[in-house]
């Protein structure tokens, strides 16, 4: 009975991480792929290059989102890209945990949808109450926290 509980918690953990990385990707598309990449065991020159590119991608998106010229995440192809990013991030995390991939993949995509429309709703609700960049920074903090949770050791 102890093994079943341990396995169940492990499965739940993978699923929770999958949804979390999906929600993070819905907020910032780069957060589906970059955090799993940055916390991977990739080494050597190509591993270093991949990690730098991932970090720069996140930094660029976090910065670009604050610009007045940033488009809506709800414009096409925004939602599908964010859902795919969440699904791929969840797939990487599931493979890393040596778990099945179907449910994590689905939860990553669902989290991507939740983060996309939930984040847009948060930003719309914040309009007029505070400057948009402040609402964006709060969303960044939530998304980065979810990505950190999803990729923790």
Which positions does each model-derived feature cover?
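Short amphipathic, positively biased membrane-proximal segments
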Residues: 1-153
């Amino acid at each position: 009975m102890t093994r079943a509980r341990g396995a169940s918690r492990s499965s739940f953990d993978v699923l929770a991480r999958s949804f979390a990385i999906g929600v993070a990707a819905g907020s910032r598309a780069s957060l589906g792929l970059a955090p799993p990449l940055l916390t991977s065991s990739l080494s050597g020159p190509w591993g270093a290059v991949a990690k730098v590119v991932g970090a720069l991608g996140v930094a660029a998106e976090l910065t670009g989102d604050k610009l007045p010229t940033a488009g809506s995440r709800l414009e096409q192809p925004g939602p599908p890209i964010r859902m795919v990013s969440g699904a791929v991030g969840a797939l990487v995390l599931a493979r890393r945990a040596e778990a099945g991939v179907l449910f994590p993949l689905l939860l990553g995509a669902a989290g991507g949808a939740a983060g996309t429309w939930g984040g847009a709703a948060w930003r719309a609700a914040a309009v007029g109450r505070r400057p948009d960049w402040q609402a964006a920074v709060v969303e960044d903090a939530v998304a980065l926290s979810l990505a950190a949770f999803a990729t923790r050791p």
